[in-house]
Amino acid sequence: MFLGLDLSTQQLKGVVIDESLNVHQEVAVDFDRDLSDYNTIKGVYRNGYEVFAPVCMWLDAIDLLFERLKASVDVSKIQAISGAGQQHASVFLLKGSKKALNSLDAKSSLKQQLESLIHPTSPNWQDASTTKECEELESCIGGAKALADLTGSKAHLRFTGPQIKRFRRLHPETYENTERIALVSNFLASVLLQTEAPLDISDVCGMNLWDIQNEKFDIRLLEEVAGNSKGPDLANKLGTVEINGAKHLGPIGKYFVKKYGFSPNCQIIPLTGDNPATILSLPLRPGKDVLLSLGTSTTALMATQNYVCSPEYHMFAHPVTQNHYMVMLCYKNGSLAREQVRNTINEKYNVSDNTSWDRFNESILNPNIKGAGEKKQLGLFYPQREILPAVGPGTWRFAIQGTELYQVDKDEESWDYPDEDASAIVESQNLDIRMRITPLLTGIPQPDRVYVVGGASRNEAIVFKISQVLGCDVYRLKHGGSNACAVGGAIKAAYAMNGKGFTFEEYVNKSWDESKKIELIMNKPSAQTYEEYGKLLPFLKKAEDIAIQQSDIRH
């Protein structure tokens, strides 16, 4: 058996699979519910533009998850562990932490032994406090395009490089006392190994520091973040990067063997970022298929053999296959924005369960209610500062009449508020995805398939609109779809143990029984429907330009 872990914003999840890559067990720790003493809301604390999480909460979650895992499966049969962490977030391990990891005692908790040697908080991917640092990072390298060409992305507020620079400015003494700066992925791997684990080849691409094609940290960027002549010191704090995503880093630490019953031969395989792990959960055909992860954020993922960068999207090294890449579009306002619309609709109709999606879905699926596309409406809903497009926070509603685009207010007679917000937000979100992924496809005008994972993949109305707007069949994992990231991590572990002589794609296809693994949940629409949505794309671009002009936020 193989274990995949996913240390995400709101939960730590674990998925156990067998040699045939079938899911056997799923366990989870919900931070707000199971570790309520930390008083997080959706896994984080907020202070203006700052969004961060308590690192000790993650340590407690590891212990609790393994307690639950031990009670549900024979963990001694787990041959290898891999997985993922939320991308970009940094963990500052202070001097003495390596020694403490080496000597963990199974009679005490992880938190009790490591708390004093870790900076208390880690910035979350939703953090938007590094505008100044992003501008400085782009300036030192020649602009957003130059930085994207080098590192795969323009400077982003959540990326680790800008976050480290801000941390050094705000906490100079702690920075100097830092022994290791880890990403969540190799922090979790370090805990499991009880020694410092290297950074992962794919996850390191989310730092704005890594020269992807030459596979090394760029000294100019290190100098900008660490200060003049301090680049080598920062490189030492970051440590090495493991190029081989299937590398056996070593056996699991004695703490986990004694406390939970893991085999001392259980291997730890490099953990990667949550998005790179997610693409490993499905056999995506490069340039043909799209994976939509519908979680707190919305991410569109594609595999590709071509290194073609743009400030409009992210390019990462593939987590397993060398000389292959992963393209990612990331939207901060995913499920949280849709939930706000849902809540407003539920309040209008006095729905007792405010978490119910029934009224929201009816507003989209009811044949007597015209969808936003039919009424030629667009809605941009950004309760948080958005990444794509760089705008917000704010809400913008638009109506299309002939060749003209008009900004409208929710109280105008032409807009049935809040019911029509449901179609507007779902259709506009997917129109933006369509607009940005089409140039990345190889030899086809629209995707062959879209795979959906994450919580909203179970929502019929949302999936229906994805199919209509993107113009293709929509598929979902039969098992583990809500935990696709952890599933991908488990498959990564299985490949590391059993995939010798095969590429990752060959290994997965060898074990992949499509009839058992995935299900077709929505058929592609008519060509006419797809074309009608295509006519809205120029108006969406205009709407986003208007929102950018009206927003004073530079992202």
From Swiss-Prot:
Annotated source species: Schizosaccharomyces pombe (strain 972 / ATCC 24843) (Fission yeast)
Binding site for ATP: W357, G455, A456, N459
Record carries keyword Cytoplasm: yes
Name this polypeptide is given: Xylulose kinase
Catalytic activity: D-xylulose + ATP = D-xylulose 5-phosphate + ADP + H(+)
Pfam families in UniProt: FGGY_C, FGGY_N
Domain of life: Eukaryota
Entry similarity comment: Belongs to the FGGY kinase family.
